[in-house]
Amino acid sequence: MSGLGIMVLALLLLVFMATSHQDGGGKQATQRDAINVRRRRSITRRVVTETCKEYCEDRDKTCCGLENGQPDCANLCLG
């Protein structure tokens, strides 16, 4: 009976290890996608024109780029 118990415990341990390994891969992929979105946003959003700079400087803010054709001003640009 103890041999059968050890085999069952070993099988449960293997199943647990296999499922936790799969979950870890999913989490990694999600984190990697989130990082890629942040990089893409920061690259595409930083289109700053002189008009935007002047518009935001008049309001004592920083130009973060154009949003829907309008200057996007903020104290600190995020993303």
Swiss-Prot record:
Keywords tagged on the record: Amidation, Cleavage on pair of basic residues, Disulfide bond, Knottin, Neurotoxin, Secreted, Signal, Toxin
Organism whose genome encodes this protein: Conus ventricosus
Pfam family for this entry, one: Conotoxin
Cellular localisation: Secreted
Record keyword ATP-binding present: no
Gene Ontology terms: cellular component: extracellular region
GO molecular function per UniProt: ion channel inhibitor activity; toxin activity
Cystine pairings recorded for this chain: 52-64, 56-73, 63-77
Family: Belongs to the conotoxin O3 superfamily.
Domain-level remarks: The presence of a 'disulfide through disulfide knot' structurally defines this protein as a knottin. The cysteine framework is VI/VII (C-C-CC-C-C).
Residues of the signal peptide: 1-20
Protein's name according to its UniProt entry: Conotoxin VnMSGL-0122
Tissue/organ expression: Expressed by the venom duct.
Residue numbers carrying Leucine amide: 78
Propeptide: 21-44
